[in-house]
Amino acid sequence: MAKQVSPGVLALRKVVDDVHKEAREAKARGELVGWSSSKFPCELAAAFDLHVMYPENQAAGIAANRYGELMCQAAEDLGYDNDICGYARISLAYAAGVRVSRKYDPETGEYIIDPSTGKPLKDADGNVVMGEDGKPKKDPKTQTPYLQLDNLLEIEKLPDGPEKEKRLEAISPIRQMRIPQPDFVLCCNNICNCMTKWYENIARMCNIPLIMIDIPYNNTVDVHDENVKYVRAQFDKAIKQLEELTGKKF
């Protein structure tokens, strides 16, 4: 019997699927789509009706789908040290256009199946079907192709045609591999210091605006007025940047 998924989990999946779908559709319409750190004040983006995706969540999803090692290695091949966190490495590789892709035969277009994948094939009575070699047969419906890395930015430069179509199709269909490239980035570094350079690198790599909220370290119970003024001034600057980016008034 298949495992039952709770209504709450199904509802949350729909919320996430809808957010991803809306971002892809917005990008296709030519609207701005940004990437945001999880602690950036989301109300600012919402006030300007901006579509925002979250690289930290994306990186966790990529890792949960067992693509983390491939993406981390890709980031290291780009020159990033393996001492920085896996979230950052996965995101930086993705920002550079790296995508996990299903391997296929260029001549036939058929995907090349990894024999180590797939669930045991079962008969109508639910019994595992055994092969002549004495091992369980694999259900072909659950087998998956070998994985390789491709680069979306290189694919997009190709002329329209079968090769371009196939390479786009071969990119892993999980939603975390289909997040649009960013038009701007929103960063707040009150989680960790890595955030600052992570998002600066995305902005530099993609040649897009970075809107930054730098949170000063507070080592006392009380919050000093100077710190409040410092953060408030950055909110004012962020609003001005978003006005210039969108052409809208706050």
Regions found by a protein language model. Name each.
Residues 1-250:
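An N-terminal assembly and electron-transfer interface module characteristic of large anaerobic redox
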